Amino acid sequence: MTDTGSSDTNTDTTGTSKANTMWGGRFAAGPDAIMEAINASISFDQRMARQDIEGSRAHAAMLAATGIVESSDVDVIREGLLTVLSEIEGGTFQYSTALEDIHMNVEARLTEIIGTPAGRLHTARSRNDQVATDFKLWVRDQMDAAISGIEALQRALLGQAEAGADWVMPGFTHLQTAQPVTWGHHMMAYVEMLGRDASRFRDARTRMNESPLGAAALAGTSFPIDRDMTAEALGFDRPSANSLDAVADRDFALEFLSAASICAMHLSRFAEELVIWSSAQFRFVALSDRFSTGSSIMPQKKNPDAAELIRAKIGRIFGANVALMTVMKGLPLTYSKDMQEDKEQTFDAADNLMLALAAMEGMVRDMQANVPSLEAAASSGFSTATDLADWLVRELNMPFREAHHVTGSLVKLAEDKGCDLPDLALSDMHSVHGDITDGVFDVLGVHNSVASRTSYGGTSPVQVREQVARWRDILG
C-alpha cells in the first residue's frame, strides 16, 4: 500500500485544554499534554487513511440502504469522504494529535467540509469495529502484496534454475561438502520454500476475510444494520459471527507476522549463502554493482550489503511477531488500549518484508554464477563418495553398511595420498577391496553423479527442468 502520510508531515502537535469533541461529553477538562502524547496514534495510523475512508463509505451506503440515515445526507457524506481522501493523497491534509487517530481526524475534517451530516456517519458504529475493519483491510492488502513479491522472486529463481540446470556445484551438510548437486536444483529449493510462504499468506487471508464492521463497541447494535452488505462492499466473504471476538481479534495480524517471519527466515538463509558465495574464498557468484557497495578506505572492496541488510532486517520482522503476541497475551475481552500497539510493528514488518523481497529479487536476477568455481568445488571434498558406496551395493551386491565402510577406507586412502577419489589408481582401490573393477570410475565424476539422481525431486538436470516447468505452470 502507498504510504499516505508520515509522522513528520502535516501533523499539528499542539495540545488542547478542551475536552475532545468526539467523546468529551462526560469530561470537564481535556487531557494533559503527556496523556495526549501517549494516547495519540495519528503519527502512524494515518497509513490506514484509505482503508478508513473506504470502510466509512461502505458503512454510510448501508445506513442509507437500511433507512437509518437519509439518503440525501449519505450522498453528501460519501462525496465529502472522497474530498478528504483527495486531500490526504495530495499531501494537503492537516493531521492533529489532539484528535488522536485517523478515524477522528477524518471525521473532524469531514465535519468542516459538509457540516451537520458528518455527525450521522458514526451511527451504529464504534471506533472498536472501525479500527478492526481498517486494520484488517490494510493487512489484507499487505498479504496480497507479499504474495506478489514472493511470486516475482520465484520467477527470478526459475530463470536462474533454468539457466543452470546442468551446472554442478557442491551440496552441503554442516557447511561441509556432501554430494554434488546442480545449481538449478539449489535455486529450486528456494522456489519450493517460497511457495509454502505464499500458501501461508493465502491461507491466512482466507481465514481473516470476515468483516468486523457492525460489531460496534463489543455487543453489536440495536439499529437494523445490514452487515452482509458492508462485508460484500469491502470484499469480505462474510461478517464475523461474534461481536466480542470481532473487536478483540488480532489473529489476522499475528498470522500475517507469523507468515512474514517464516518467509523472512527463508530470505535470510539465502542472503547468508549469497554473502558466503560472493566471498573471495568461495567465488561461487558475482553480485551486480546495483546491489553491492564499496569501502571508503579499501578501493578493492565490493561488499554484498543488500544481502547483509536483508539478513539484518529479518530480525525486525521476528521482533514484530513477538511484540504483538506479547501485547495480546494478557488482554481480557474485548478491546483495550494496549491494542493500539498492534500497528507500528506490523507496519514496520510489512515494509521490511517487501523491501527484502524486492532486494532479493533484484540480486537474483542480476547475479552471475561462476560455473568453473562451482564445478571445481563440487569435484573436491570426496563429494562422490556416496556414489561409490552405491556402486559397491549395485555391482558387488555388497550390504550398504559394508559398502559404507569400504568407501570410508578409500576416502582415507585418498586423503593420505593427497588426492580425490577419481584420482586413485585401480590398484589403490584393490588394496582396500580386490573385487572393485574399473567400472567404478564411471560414477566418480560429478556430472555422472548428478545425472544419476533421477528420483522425483532429485538433482538431475532432467528433474530440475521438470520442476521448473511445473512451477512456471503454477505461477502462470
From Swiss-Prot:
Question: GO molecular function of the protein, one example?
Answer: argininosuccinate lyase activity
| A GO cellular-component term linked to this record | cytosol
- Catalysis: reaction(s): 2-(N(omega)-L-arginino)succinate = fumarate + L-arginine
Q: In which pathway does it act?
A: Amino-acid biosynthesis; L-arginine biosynthesis; L-arginine from L-ornithine and carbamoyl phosphate: step 3/3
Q: Which GO terms describe its biological process?
A: arginine biosynthetic process via ornithine; L-arginine biosynthetic process
Give its E.C. classification number: 4.3.2.1
Q: Which InterPro entries match?
A: Arg_succ_lyase_C (IPR029419), Argininosuccinate_lyase (IPR009049), Fumarase/histidase_N (IPR024083), Fumarate_lyase_CS (IPR020557), Fumarate_lyase_fam (IPR000362), Fumarate_lyase_N (IPR022761), L-Aspartase-like (IPR008948)
Q: Which top EC class is given?
A: lyase
Which CDD domains does its entry note? Argininosuccinate_lyase
Q: Where is this region: Disordered?
A: 1-22
User: Which compartment or compartments is the protein found in?
Assistant: Cytoplasm
Question: Chief localization class?
Answer: cytoplasm
Residue ranges annotated as compositionally biased, kind Low complexity, are 1-17
Alphabetically sorted, this entry's keywords are: Amino-acid biosynthesis, Arginine biosynthesis, Cytoplasm, Lyase
Q: Which family does it belong to?
A: Belongs to the lyase 1 family. Argininosuccinate lyase subfamily.
| NCBIfam families in alphabetical order | argH
Q: What is this protein called?
A: Argininosuccinate lyase
Q: Which organism is it from?
A: Jannaschia sp. (strain CCS1)
Query: Source gene?
Result: argH
